């Protein structure tokens, strides 16, 4: 026999639904009051209170950190402007505006950094990783000349960019390989090239109008005559335990050539004959080899 069940009234169902909703609200309210994180015992410090806003020291700003007056520079013969790499405080007409751009052919910037360009006689001299020197007009960016200064297919040492140095008469360049080349900065023609036994690394740095100094991958320092490329003197290199892929770009100041090895060793040699003034070279304190 089938039994009939009496259905709850509408009011009863409504009251039941209200109770369920109320229960859910209570559960959420209790959850909101609960502690959400585990607190460890011990003292606490307010780290945000130690934050400081960068402020400019007014007195130091007025002093300009000893830079002196800004000077207008029309030539850029070395990294750092001068052979001592102490170009000083250069004047700029801000904001800077792009006048032109050009591409150096066959660069391999993923393999080697590029050398810093040099600017003399209204020209920009730039060096690509393919050992090609490109000459651009400073005002228009037009290519005026190109010169191959070494074997484009020769191997490169990662991080060795080669280098450029120039004055009103000559540009000296090497591409991180074995050749050192002089180019007439007026006619853009090669004057001379000399080949070293090891790849060159730092420099070139001009010694006035008389010479040029570079370093090689073994940390030796070499000085050449500027007019014909003849080797004047060569050091025996910084200590082997301080050298990693050569030395930095030499600095020439007050008759002294100063070189810093990548390993941290610093040496100073007399410009005239390479005589050691400061530091140590191959563990010796004698004079450099001269020719």
Feature annotation, model-predicted:
Residues 34-36:
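Bacterial signal peptide processing site
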Residues 42-56, 63-99:
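Blade/loop signatures of beta-propeller domains
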């Amino acid at each position: 026999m089938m039994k009939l069940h009496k259905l709850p009234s509408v009011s009863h169902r409504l009251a039941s639904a209200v109770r369920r909703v109320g229960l859910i609200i209570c559960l959420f309210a209790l959850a909101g009051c609960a502690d959400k994180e585990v607190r460890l015992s011990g003292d606490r410090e307010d780290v945000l209170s130690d934050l400081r806003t960068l402020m400019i020291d007014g007195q130091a700003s007025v002093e300009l950190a000893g830079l002196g007056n800004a000077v207008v520079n029309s030539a850029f013969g070395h990294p750092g402007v001068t052979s001592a790499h102490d170009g000083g405080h250069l004047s700029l007409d801000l904001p800077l505006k792009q006048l032109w751009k050009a591409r150096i052919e066959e660069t391999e910037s993923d393999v080697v950094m590029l050398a810093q360009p040099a600017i003399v006689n209204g020209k920009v001299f730039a060096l690509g990783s393919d050992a090609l020197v490109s000459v651009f007009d400073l005002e228009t960016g037009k290519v005026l000349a190109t010169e191959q200064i070494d074997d484009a297919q020769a191997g490169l040492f990662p991080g060795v960019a080669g280098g450029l140095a120039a004055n009103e008469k000559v540009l000296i360049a090497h591409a991180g390989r074995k050749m050192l080349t002089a180019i007439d900065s007026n006619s853009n023609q090669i004057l001379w090239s000399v080949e070293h036994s090891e790849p060159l690394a730092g420099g070139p740095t001009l010694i006035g109008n008389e010479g040029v100094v570079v370093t090689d991958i073994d940390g030796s320092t070499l000085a050449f005559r500027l007019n014909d490329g003849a080797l004047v003197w060569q050091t025996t290199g910084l200590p082997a335990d301080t050298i990693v892929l050569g030395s930095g770009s030499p600095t020439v100041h007050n008759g002294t050539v100063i070189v810093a090895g990548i390993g941290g060793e610093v040496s100073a040699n007399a410009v005239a004959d390479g005589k050691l003034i400061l530091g140590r070279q191959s563990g010796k304190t004698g004079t450099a080899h001269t020719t």
